[in-house]
């Protein structure tokens, strides 16, 4: 019975050896050793053989003896960990709990949530969407002051204006009623141009400008809701509503070419035409020198009853000249045209009558600069300290001529208008304007000083025919 069991075990071992050799291609002796080492476990023996890269066909006797002993000493060695594939992190659901709740509630929660972007968002509903020039034009059309806010994204106080001040309903109401609100970033092109012109240094920055002249009236840096309302209320109490152009847009009409927009060639042509006209009227001017000298002492200004004294004539002569001008306006207009050409070509100092006609015949070029004599300027700014600070003004006339005059800073703007009118450019037909910033001086109050009008210490003033 025992012999029958031993033969069955040996036949089973032979079968395992044959399977091992068929799988691995090794010899029967190698298969026998591997099966003995693995306790007749065919799978483990094949794995061990393949992992070891194969074993020699006939191992030495010493290795054989070691292998024969190994089953007794290493029977407790555990099997290798089988290979398997698993996912370390399970995929998250496509929507979170909050998103699923919002979908179920129809987005009601999203309306209640206020993000940081909403808190610090600029006041789009208040802002003027355009450039600085269009904001000024809009302020003139709507008779509203121009409020400027320069934003620096690196300054948190500027962001607080968006969060606390501009979002307040009381602030919004007062801005909508009285101001054109223009906000721009400091590093933008418009912001850099504004900073360079108005010399901005501190942030946050809020200022109020007159849209007609571009003059800065007030400037604030630290504001909250209460202080802003107090400051704006005080400003409106002091300056009131802006009195400017009517809210109705002006009718478009054919506009003549202005002196500023004209090229040098066109200005030179205008000067040559004026010179030819002067030569043509030389004979008429020589006959009427005495009379035109008397009438040039005074001029009517803008339809008012005032007289503009240039050379200090007495009141009786002024009343007599006024009566003459009222009786024959067409004749007086002809005299004015003839008189106006003569002072532009005369030298600053008064000359003899015989030499005055010679100067009248000189051609007038664009490069000619006429300086105003102290005697004439004293007559215009009578009653003002002429020894104080001066304003250097370069006047450019429509005929291409230029005149440089010096007036005290405290002289009224009316004095400048009178001087231009004495040169033959009445206020009814001509206006004064500056180029940068482009503004019309004829729209300002004539009682303000040259310093308040922004013409100090020096400025170029253009005389242009009204449209």
Curated annotation (Swiss-Prot):
Chief subcellular location: nucleus
A matching Pfam family: UBX
Residue ranges, compositional bias (Polar residues): 59-70
Protein localization: Nucleus
Record PTM N-acetylalanine, positions in chain: 2
SMART domains in alphabetical order: UAS (SM00594), UBX (SM00166)
Keywords, in A-Z order: Acetylation, Isopeptide bond, Nucleus, Phosphoprotein, Ubl conjugation
The protein's name: UBX domain-containing protein 7
Source organism per UniProt: Mus musculus
């Amino acid at each position: 019975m025992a012999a029958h069991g031993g033969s069955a075990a040996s036949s089973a071992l032979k079968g395992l050896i044959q399977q091992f050799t068929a799988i691995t291609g090794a010899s029967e002796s190698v298969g026998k050793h591997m099966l003995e080492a693995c306790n007749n476990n065919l799978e483990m023996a094949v794995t061990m053989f393949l992992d070891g890269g194969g074993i020699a066909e006939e191992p030495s006797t010493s290795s054989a003896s070691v292998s024969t002993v190994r089953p007794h000493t290493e029977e407790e060695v555990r099997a290798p960990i089988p290979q398997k594939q698993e996912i370390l992190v399970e995929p998250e659901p496509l929507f979170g709990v909050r998103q699923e709740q919002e979908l179920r509630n129809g987005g009601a929660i999203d309306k209640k949530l206020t993000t940081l972007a909403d808190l610090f968002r600029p006041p789009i509903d208040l802002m003027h969407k355009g450039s600085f020039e269009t904001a000024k034009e809009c302020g003139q059309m709507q008779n509203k002051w121009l409020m400027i806010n320069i934003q620096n994204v690196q300054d948190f106080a500027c962001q607080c204006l968006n969060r606390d001040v501009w979002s307040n309903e009381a602030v919004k109401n007062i801005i909508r009623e009285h101001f054109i609100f223009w906000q721009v970033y400091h590093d933008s092109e418009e912001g850099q141009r504004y900073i360079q012109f108005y010399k901005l240094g501190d942030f946050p920055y809020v200022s109020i400008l007159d849209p007609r002249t571009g003059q800065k009236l007030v400037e604030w840096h630290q504001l909250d809701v209460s202080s802003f309302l107090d400051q704006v209320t005080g400003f409106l109490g002091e300056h009131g509503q802006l009195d400017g152009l009517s809210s109705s847009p002006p009718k478009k009409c054919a506009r003549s070419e202005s002196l500023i927009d004209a090229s040098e060639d066109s200005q030179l042509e205008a000067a040559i035409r004026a010179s030819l006209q002067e030569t043509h009227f030389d004979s008429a001017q020589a006959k009427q020198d005495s009379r035109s000298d008397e009438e040039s002492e005074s001029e009517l200004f803008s339809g008012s009853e005032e007289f503009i004294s240039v050379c200090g004539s007495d009141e009786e002569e002024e009343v007599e000249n006024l009566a003459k001008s009222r009786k024959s306006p067409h004749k007086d207009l002809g005299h004015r045209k003839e008189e106006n050409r003569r002072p532009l070509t005369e030298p600053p100092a008064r000359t003899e009558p015989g030499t005055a006609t010679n100067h009248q015949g000189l051609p007038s070029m664009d490069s000619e600069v006429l300086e105003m004599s102290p005697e004439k300027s004293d007559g215009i700014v009578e009653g003002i300290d002429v020894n104080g600070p001066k304003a250097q003004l370069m006047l450019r006339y429509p005929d291409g001529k230029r005149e440089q005059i010096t007036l005290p800073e405290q002289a009224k703007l009316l004095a400048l208008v009178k001087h231009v009118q004495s040169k033959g450019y009445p206020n009814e037909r001509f206006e004064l304007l500056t180029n940068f910033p482009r503004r019309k001086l004829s729209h300002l109050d004539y009682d303000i000083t040259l310093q308040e009008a922004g013409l100090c210490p020096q400025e170029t003033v253009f005389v242009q025919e009204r449209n």
